[in-house]
Regions:
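Iron-associated oxidoreductase/ferritin-like identity signal
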Residues: 1-162
Length: 162
């Protein structure tokens, strides 16, 4: 198995996890976010497969952050909670953070040791995209956990803004 096979396998596992998790979540916003992550990981696997068969051109820029930002902002403007209190979502976001951090490390390590410049470049880009996925998922996890941390009351003092 080559380094590209390992990377494809890693992306496919992440894609499968997000797709399965989307099926477990009852919150519509959480479901949409997991669906966006599923699609993003599928694009990564596709780019890696193209690199493997020699037809790779360029990795398209990610629109994940803009799509999720629009989803959350739209929900907030409508006066709705962007993410509900679906208990399974907390567990899913924690696992997603672990997955994204591990995938980012994998790409950074493999980019550093790659001999092929195209592979090195692709792995560097994928590492940056996985880092942005981690930041997104960790921000969502923090947003989701905020209500559990504090009770909204003047007696508890000032809280950081969401």
């Amino acid at each position: 198995m080559t380094i590209l096979d390992d990377a494809i396998s890693l992306e496919e596992r992440a894609r499968a996890y997000y797709a399965e998790a989307a099926g477990r979540v009852t919150d519509p916003s959480g479901n949409k976010i997991l669906d966006l992550l599923t699609k993003e990981e599928a694009l990564h696997a596709e780019a890696l497969a193209k690199m493997k068969d020699g037809s790779y051109g360029e990795l398209a820029g990610s629109t994940l952050l803009q799509n999720v930002r629009g989803l959350v902002e739209g929900a907030v403007k409508k006066g709705k909670d962007a993410i509900s209190s679906d208990g399974s979502l907390r567990e899913i976001l924690q696992k997603a953070m672990e997955t994204e951090a591990a995938t980012k490390r994998f790409y950074e390590e493999k980019a550093a040791s790659a001999d092929d410049e195209k592979v090195k470049d692709l792995f560097g880009k994928l590492a940056r995209q996985e880092a942005s996925h981690y930041l997104l998922v960790s921000s969502l996890a923090e947003y989701f956990d905020r209500p559990a941390e504090w009770v909204e009351s003047a007696e508890f003092g000032l809280r950081p803004e969401y």
